[in-house]
């Protein structure tokens, strides 16, 4: 990745709220399936804004060293085909994770905050276009500079 796009908490909140507006009326949804881990943050905003309390997760590991995507590994999945659920992730990048999500939850509404060209067509809605060669630094990954997770120390 040659470029970086740094997202602040304020920016993230604003974009996630905009995504929430597009999902109204809230009464059409049974719940949210958050793609762990990046989708946990927008799921919290969507849940608050839409008044949704039923939150499930699907846990898929794809980024193995903060930079390169590796083979997908499903660690946990919410049951069902997604009918009446919003599936949310922070980003659709190459589309590898998105294709797996679509296979698991074909009847869900799949949304992300950010989308890169290679994966954008795989989600039903997103807020911000990001160039394919750009790495997104999400606010939960940052201190004043990148802070590695405690488990890696």
Curated annotation (Swiss-Prot):
User: Corresponding gene?
Assistant: gpt
Q: What does the similarity note say?
A: Belongs to the purine/pyrimidine phosphoribosyltransferase family. XGPT subfamily.
Compartment(s) where it occurs, according to its Swiss-Prot or TrEMBL record: Cell inner membrane
Task performed by this protein: Purine salvage pathway enzyme that catalyzes the transfer of the ribosyl-5-phosphate group from 5-phospho-alpha-D-ribose 1-diphosphate (PRPP) to the N9 position of the 6-oxopurines guanine and xanthine to form the corresponding ribonucleotides GMP (guanosine 5'-monophosphate) and XMP (xanthosine 5'-monophosphate), with the release of PPi. To a lesser extent, also acts on hypoxanthine.
Question: Could you say which residues bind GMP here?
Answer: 93-97, 135-136
Main localization, broad class:
membrane
GO terms, biological process: GMP salvage; IMP salvage; purine ribonucleoside salvage; XMP salvage
Q: How does it assemble?
A: Homotetramer.
UniProt GO MF annotations: guanine phosphoribosyltransferase activity; hypoxanthine phosphoribosyltransferase activity; magnesium ion binding; xanthine phosphoribosyltransferase activity
Q: How does it sit in the membrane?
A: Peripheral membrane protein
Any single Gene Ontology cellular-component annotation: cytosol
Name of the protein in its database record: Xanthine-guanine phosphoribosyltransferase
- Where, in this chain's numbering, is xanthine bound? 93, 136
Q: Which UniProt keywords apply?
A: Cell inner membrane, Cell membrane, Glycosyltransferase, Magnesium, Membrane, Metal-binding, Purine salvage, Transferase
Q: Which reaction does it catalyse?
A: GMP + diphosphate = guanine + 5-phospho-alpha-D-ribose 1-diphosphate; XMP + diphosphate = xanthine + 5-phospho-alpha-D-ribose 1-diphosphate; IMP + diphosphate = hypoxanthine + 5-phospho-alpha-D-ribose 1-diphosphate
What the entry lists under PROSITE patterns is as follows:
PUR_PYR_PR_TRANSFER (PS00103)
Q: Name one Pfam family in it.
A: Pribosyltran
């Amino acid at each position: 990745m040659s470029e970086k796009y740094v997202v602040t908490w304020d920016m993230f909140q604003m974009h996630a709220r905009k995504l929430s507006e597009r999902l109204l009326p809230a009464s059409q949804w049974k719940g949210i399936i958050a793609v762990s881990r990046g989708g946990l943050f927008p799921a919290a905003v969507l849940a608050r804004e839409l008044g949704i309390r039923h939150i499930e997760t699907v846990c898929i590991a794809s980024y193995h060293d903060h930079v390169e995507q590796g083979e997908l590994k499903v660690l946990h999945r919410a049951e069902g085909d997604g009918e009446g659920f919003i599936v949310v992730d922070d980003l659709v990048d190459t589309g590898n994770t998105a294709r797996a999500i679509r296979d698991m939850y074909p009847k869900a509404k799949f949304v992300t905050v950010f989308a890169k060209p290679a994966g954008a067509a795989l989600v039903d809605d997103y807020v911000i276009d990001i160039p394919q060669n750009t790495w997104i630094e999400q606010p939960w990954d940052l201190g004043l500079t990148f802070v590695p997770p405690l488990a890696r120390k």
